[in-house]
Amino acid sequence: MKFEWLFLTIAPCDAAEPWQLGFQDAATPMMQGIIDLHHDIFFFLILILVFVSRILVRALWHFHYKKNPIPQRIVHGTTIEILRTIFPSIIPMFIAIPSFALLYSMDEVVVDPAITIKAIGHQWYRTYEYSDYNSSDEQSLTFDSYTIPEDDLELGQSRLLEVDNRVVVPAKTHLRIIVTPADVPHSWAVPSLGVKCDAVPGRLNQISISVQREGVYYGQCSEICGTNHAFTPIVVEAVPSKDYGSRVFNQLIPQTTGEA
């Protein structure tokens, strides 16, 4: 039990956990930037909370009706007017600069990605297409990803988060994910990767990611898409670059060949 607790404290958190309050561990620079921005804004939030609380407590203490039935009237205070104008203007500036920097960096698209993957949302499963790989009949490598029913889960697998076919990607490689639906609006969201891209009918949205460490990352559809909206999870498995080719060709290609 002791070793299990130690493992849970040092192991990355890449899936939703019961009673979870914080973020999942970052696996991309984008998610790390989101976490850092949250901490920076939270610092200013604490400052404002302490300052406003002090003013309220001081006002309640010094202007109690029993001690001072006639409150002191301050007609004008130049210093107070200047301070309460300058500081509320400076704080949003310190928040806006890193916010816009992160926002624009999230919209940047890699010009020449190493791999392009197309994620197509359905009711209620997903189809993934590796556009860089073609089979013998010149068709792109394509496979479907369905939720594993609760009765078929193996020991250690997460309920409503595991799929039969994972998205296998190489770690520390620039990837482009193209997201689109086949029917109604969907969304492709993986918290550990800092990714949430809406799938809008008739449009192709794209995002660029670079997974910095090996692991298995879980996500879900973040757009209400119908009755089984909660049963369309996303599982991304990042493997070392040297193992990526064998994983794709040994696991995915036989599946597509069998379906054909």
Swiss-Prot record:
Protein residues bound to Cu cation A1: H186, C221, C225
EC number(s) on file: 7.1.1.9
Compartments reported by the entry: Mitochondrion inner membrane
GO-annotated molecular function: copper ion binding; cytochrome-c oxidase activity
Parts of the chain that traverse the membrane: 40-61, 77-104
Residues that bind Cu cation A2: C221, E223, C225, H229
Self-association and partners: Component of the cytochrome c oxidase (complex IV, CIV), a multisubunit enzyme composed of a catalytic core of 3 subunits and several supernumerary subunits. The complex exists as a monomer or a dimer and forms supercomplexes (SCs) in the inner mitochondrial membrane with ubiquinol-cytochrome c oxidoreductase (cytochrome b-c1 complex, complex III, CIII).
Note: The gene coding for this protein is probably silent. Soybean nuclear genome encode an active cox2.
Protein name: Cytochrome c oxidase subunit 2
Organism of origin: Glycine max (Soybean)
Classification of source organism: Eukaryota, Viridiplantae, Streptophyta, Embryophyta, Tracheophyta
